[in-house]
Regions:
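Residue-level signature of outer-membrane beta-barrel architecture
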Residues: 157-159, 262-264, 275, 298, ...
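Structured alpha-helical segments in the cores of large, soluble enzyme domains
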Residues: 256-262, 511-521
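Repeated loop/turn-to-beta-strand initiation elements of outer-membrane beta-barrel proteins
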Residues: 266-269, 303-306, 388-391, 459, ...
Length: 554
C-alpha cells in the first residue's frame, strides 16, 4: 500500500495476512517545503504563496525535445496558459500567449520579464533558460502594475556554479515537415465541374468553365506523356498540380550550443554561444540565428555582490513571405504547372479566375534579407547591510535594430501549352529596391530594498520596497526606389527614381514606486499586500501618476 499527501514523503507499506491495525506517520518533505518559486522582484517559498503562480522547469523540456523558440514550447506546460501560432515561418515567432483567456480588447499578451527586466521571448536562446514562472492572478501580478493586466511570464536564465569548470556541448539535427498537409484538389477537370456547380448553387446562369475545357483535360490526362500540337508534354500543357506538394517540403534544422560554466567561493560564471539554422518547409524562408550569453556574479566581500547578465543575438532571415499560407493556396489552381524551362507557369485554361496565380512566382520575385540584432546587458549589485536587510541596484541597457533590404528579381510567366509569355521579364528600369530600418534603445534604473526575518521559528516576515526609472527611444525610416541600371547592381544607391520615403520617431519615460509585504505564520496562515505607483511621460504632467494596489489577501 502506498500512502501520500502533499508536502510529505510518500511511504510504501507492505500488507500481509497478519497485518491488523496500522499507525502510519508521514515525514515532512523538507525539499518540497523549502522549494522556492520566482515571483515579481524576488522569490518566495512555494508553501507561502498566496497568488496563482505556476513554475515550469524549462531546462528539462530542452533535454527531451527539440525547441526552436521559447514561446512555442510553452504550449501545454501550464494550466491556464494558451499558446497558439499564427505562422510556422522560421524565425518569425508569431506565437500568441494568453494567460487565463483574453483580458482586454487591445493587446492581451502577458508581460515578459527576463532576469528581472522587461524583454522579449524572441531574445532568448531556449537552451539558456533554466526556469519559467507564470503569474496568473491579480495577487501575483499587482507588483508590476497596469502592464501586468494580462499576466506575467518570468524567465530565469542559467547561472554558473561554484564547482570546477565544466564544458557542455549540445548538438541536434532534426527534420522539419508539415504535420498535416492540406488536401488540395489536383484533378483539374473535377475542380472545374465543382466550380460550375457552385456557380449554379448561388443562382448564376452561366458556368465558369466551358464544358469543352473539362473534356479536353480529361482526355489529355489519359496520356500525360503525350505531346500537344506545340510539342509540349500533356502533363505540362494540361496540368493537374497538387500545390500543397509543390510548396511544402521537408527542411533540416541544425541547432548547436556550447557553454562553459564554473566558479569558486568568490565568483561564478556561465558563458554560452548558440547557432541555429532552420531551412524551413517553403523556399526562400530560411532563418539563421547566432547568440551569446555571459552571466557573471562575483562576491569580493561577504557583504557585496556584483555581476552582469549580458545577451546578444543576430538573426538573418530570407525575405520570402509565406505567413498567410491559406491565401497563397486559395490563389493557386491545379491548372497551372509550377516551373519549366526557366519560366513560371500561368493558368492554362482561358476561363480561369483572374485571381488565380502561381504561388512560386510570387515567392521568387523578391530577394534580400531581414536582419534582427539585439543586445541586452544588466549590471547589478547587492549590498547586505545585515543578514536580513539588503539593497539591490540594477542598471539595464537594451538595444534592438531591425533592417530589411529587398530588391526585385527578373522572372516571367509563360502559358506552356502555346508558349505565350503572359508576364514578361521586368526590365531593370522597372525593378525596385527598398529598405526598412528600425532602431530602439532603452535603459532601466532599479533600486530594491529587501527585508526578511523569521521570528520565533514560526513568524515569517518579508518586505520589499522598490523604485524604477525607464526610458525608451524609437526610430524608424523606410524608402523605396526603382530604376536599376543592371539587375546585379541592386543596392539602394544604384536606383534612379524615388517612389516612397517615410519615417517616425518616439520616446517616452516612466517612473515607478512599488512594494510588497508578506507574513506567514507556521506556513499555514498567509498574508500579502502589494502596491505600485506609476508615472508616465505619455500623460499630462498633472495626471502622470496612477496608483495600482492589490488588496490584502489572508
Amino acid at each position: 500500500m502506498q500512502v501520500s499527501y502533499i508536502g510529505y514523503v510518500t511511504k510504501d507499506i507492505k500488507i500481509t495476512s497478519t497485518t491488523n491495525n496500522l499507525s502510519i506517520k508521514l515525514a515532512e518533505d523538507t525539499e518540497t517545503l523549502d522549494e522556492v518559486v520566482v515571483v515579481g522582484y524576488g522569490v518566495q517559498k512555494k508553501v507561502n504563496l498566496t497568488g496563482a503562480v505556476a513554475s515550469v522547469d524549462f531546462e528539462e523540456q530542452t533535454k527531451s525535445r527539440p525547441i526552436t523558440t521559447v514561446s512555442s514550447a510553452l504550449a501545454g506546460l501550464s494550466p491556464g496558459l494558451q499558446a497558439s501560432s499564427g505562422s510556422a515561418m522560421p524565425g518569425e515567432d508569431n506565437t500568441t500567449l494568453r494567460v487565463r483567456g483574453v483580458g482586454t480588447m487591445n493587446t492581451a499578451s502577458p508581460l515578459v520579464i527576463i532576469d528581472g527586466m522587461e524583454g522579449s521571448l524572441n531574445a532568448v536562446n531556449p537552451l539558456d533558460v533554466e526556469n519559467i514562472s507564470i503569474l496568473k492572478d491579480a495577487a501575483s501580478c499587482a507588483i508590476y502594475g497596469a502592464r501586468a493586466a494580462n499576466g506575467v511570464i518570468l524567465v530565469t536564465t542559467k547561472t554558473g556554479t561554484r564547482d570546477k569548470i565544466s564544458i557542455n556541448y549540445s548538438g541536434r539535427i532534426s527534420f522539419n515537415s508539415p504535420t498535416r498537409m492540406i488536401k488540395m484538389m489536383s484533378n483539374y477537370a473535377d475542380y472545374m465541374e465543382l466550380m460550375n456547380e457552385s456557380y449554379r448553387n448561388v443562382g448564376k446562369s452561366d458556368d465558369l468553365f466551358d464544358q469543352k475545357y473539362i473534356d479536353l483535360w480529361r482526355e489529355k490526362s489519359k496520356d500525360p506523356n503525350g505531346l500537344n500540337e506545340n510539342g509540349v508534354p500533356n502533363y505540362i500543357a494540361y496540368p493537374n498540380t497538387d500545390w500543397a506538394e509543390e510548396l511544402f517540403s521537408g527542411g533540416v534544422i541544425h541547432d548547436h550550443n556550447l557553454s562553459v560554466s564554473g566558479g569558486s567561493d568568490k565568483i561564478r560564471f556561465l558563458l554560452s554561444a548558440g547557432y541555429q539554422d532552420n531551412e524551413g518547409v517553403v523556399d526562400n524562408t530560411a532563418n539563421k540565428r547566432y547568440s551569446m550569453r555571459a552571466n557573471i556574479e562575483a562576491n569580493p566581500t561577504k557583504w557585496l555582490t556584483v555581476g552582469t547578465r549580458t545577451y546578444a543575438s543576430q538573426m538573418d532571415r530570407e525575405v520570402g513571405d509565406f505567413s498567410n499560407a491559406n491565401n497563397f493556396l486559395r490563389q493557386s489552381t491545379a491548372g497551372t504547372y509550377p516551373y519549366w524551362n526557366g519560366s513560371y507557369g500561368y493558368p492554362e485554361c482561358p476561363d480561369e479566375r483572374a485571381t488565380a496565380n502561381n504561388p512560386l512566382y510570387k515567392l521568387a520575385r523578391n530577394d534580400g534579407f531581414k536582419r534582427y540584432n539585439r543586445f541586452n546587458t544588466t549590471l547589478f549589485s547587492k549590498i547586505k547591510f545585515f543578514e536580513d536587510l539588503s539593497w539591490d541596484f540594477n542598471f539595464n541597457y537594451n538595444r534592438y535594430i531591425y533592417e530589411t533590404r529587398q530588391h526585385g528579381v527578373p522572372a516571367y510567366q509563360t502559358r506552356f501549352s502555346d508558349g505565350v509569355i503572359v508576364d514578361g521579364i521586368t526590365p531593370p528600369s522597372q525593378l525596385s529596391t527598398s529598405f526598412d530600418y528600425e532602431s530602439n534603445y532603452s535603459y532601466t534604473l532599479e533600486n530594491l530594498i529587501n527585508y526578511h526575518h523569521t521570528f520565533a521559528q514560526k513568524h515569517d516576515v518579508s518586505a520589499l520596497l522598490g523604485y524604477q526609472e525607464f526610458y525608451k527611444n524609437y526610430y524608424k525610416v523606410n524608402a523605396a526606389k526603382k530604376g536599376l541600371i543592371d539587375e546585379s547592381l541592386n543596392q539602394f544607391d544604384e536606383a534612379t527614381e524615388m517612389t516612397s520615403i517615410g519615417g517616425s520617431t518616439e520616446d517616452y519615460a516612466t517612473r515607478s514606486y512599488f512594494g510588497r509585504v508578506n507574513y506567514a505564520y507556521d506556513s499555514r496562515y498567509l498574508f500579502e499586500a502589494n502596491f505600485r505607483y506609476d508615472g508616465s511621460s505619455r500623460f499630462h504632467k498633472d495626471l502622470s501618476l496612477i496608483h495600482i494596489s492589490e488588496p490584502t489577501r489572508p
